[in-house]
Every structure is written in C-alpha cells, then in structure tokens.
Amino acid sequence: MQLLCYFVILFVGIAPWSSLANDDGCNEVVCGSVVSKCLITQSCQCKLNDCHCCKDCLNCLGELYIECCGCLDMCPKHKDVLPSLTPRSEIGDIEGVPELFDTLTAEDDEGWSTIRFSMRAGFKQRVQGGASGDAGNGNGNGNAGSAGVTLCTVIYVNSCIRANKCRQQCESMGASSYRWFHDGCCECVGENCLNYGINESRCRGCPEDQDQLLTADTVPAEAEQDLERFFGNEEIEDEWGYGEEDEFS
C-alpha cells in the first residue's frame, strides 16, 4: 500500500511537468530544477491574461525566466501583450558612491555606453515633494546641470552578463541602482535618476540581433516618455521643460 501511494504521489508531481516540458521554448535540462521548485511553491499558478502571479513567477524563475517561461506557459504568445504583463527586467538598489560613478562615466569607455538626459522639475516634485529649486542645487558633481536642470546618468554594459554580475559591476562603479534585462543587457543607474533609469534594453552588443543601436539623439525623449507613462502624466505639462532645448536638437 505504501508503495502504491508513493507511485501516486510521484505521478501527480511529475505529470504537470511532463506535459509542460514539451511546450515551445522549454529547455528541460536547464529548467528542470527551477520549474519543479516553482510548481511546488505554486508561484506560477495563473495566466498571462489574468497575471496576478506574474511577479511571484518572475522572482521564482529569476534569471532563467526567458529560457524557462515556456515550461510553465508563462511566455507571451503575441507581440501585442501588454507591457505590464511581460516582465522584462529586474531592478535593485545599491549603496552608491556618486563621486566614483561620476568620475568613471565622465569619459567614454570600451566596456559601456554612457547616456545623460535631463530630469524635469515636475517629476522630482511629484515623487520627492521637493521645491522647484531643489532639483538644481547640485553639489558640484557631474550630474547637476545649469539653471536648475538635474541630469540623470546611466550606463549600458556593452556585452551580455548575468543578473548577479550586473549588480556586482554596477556596485563596483558606484551606481545607486541597476536594471538587468532578461536578454542579458545590464544598465547601471546614477543617483539623480527616477524609476531605475530607462526601462528599455539598449546595450550595443547584447543581444546580438538587436535591430536598433543606442543613439544619443533618441534617448532623452524616450526616457522622458517612459517616465510620463510610469506616472500617468502623458498629457500634463510640467512647470518647465529641459531648459535650452537647442542642446538636444
């Protein structure tokens, strides 16, 4: 009787995994252990069209999300899936060293691409509750611009790296936060940035089939639009804009 119970339990535990293992994009060798864990913890017990468990599932699969989401039927099936239902990156805070980060990002480097864009005063006020003049009171570092304009500095590592390596590299550079994308792209974010920098994978060499390379002309506007969407203020005019817009034309 005990032997029969054992086989029943074994079958119940393996049957769901066996049916899922044949789904498109499921690497059984790589995903076996982590998928079993997520099944046991029931971290992925929902559908993309009702994704109340997406965050838990993402955390459970971790850096293997792209490789293993097919095993749990959690990969987007269409390109028009809502971005909120398509986890693209992992974020984290670091005990930053702004002076070090500003020094390292002041000049171009073979290992990363540096992007700077101005943060408008309205965003700082809505999120941090500061006065309009606070945004421009820089302490002499490379992230404070003239006329009250605060510059956000981010760097994109040129090569693909894993999530833990991304955090380590950003920490060693003195960044205040980081964003690691599930295609292997790593973004280190300076102290004056909101919403963990730019929510878009823009590493030059990662992934290899990337269609659009990083261009300084497009980043400021797109980064601002990303923040507009995040705070739901696409139609709201801020008190003032970038300042001297000619610099960005």
Swiss-Prot record:
Biological process according to GO: amnioserosa formation; negative regulation of BMP signaling pathway; regulation of BMP signaling pathway
Pfam families in UniProt: Tsg, Tsg_N
Alphabetical UniProt keywords: Developmental protein, Glycoprotein, Secreted, Signal
InterPro entries, per the entry: Tsg
Signal peptide: 1-23
One term of GO molecular function: heparin binding
Keyword Signal in annotation: yes
Annotated tissue distribution: First appears in stage 4 embryos, expressed in two domains: a broad mid-dorsal saddle and an anterior cap, expression between the domains is continuous across the dorsal midline. At stage 5, expression is refined into 4 graded stripes in the mid-dorsal region and a paired domain in the anterior region. During stages 7 and 8, anterior expression fades and the mid dorsal stripes are located between the anterior and posterior transverse furrow (ATF and PTF). Expressing cells become incorporated into the deepening PTF.
Top-level lineage group: Eukaryota
S-S bridge residues: none
Residues with attached carbohydrate: 199
Annotated Gene Ontology cellular component terms: extracellular region; extracellular space
Subcellular compartments: Secreted
Family named by the database record: Belongs to the twisted gastrulation protein family.
Function per UniProt: Involved in dorsal-ventral patterning. Required for specification of a narrow strip of dorsal midline cells that will give rise to the amnioserosa, but not for specification of dorsal ectoderm cells. Inhibits BMP signaling; enhances the binding of sog to dpp, thus enhancing the antagonistic activity of sog.
Subunit structure: Component of a complex composed of dpp, sog and tsg.
Name of the molecule in the record: Protein twisted gastrulation
UniProt organism field: Drosophila melanogaster (Fruit fly)
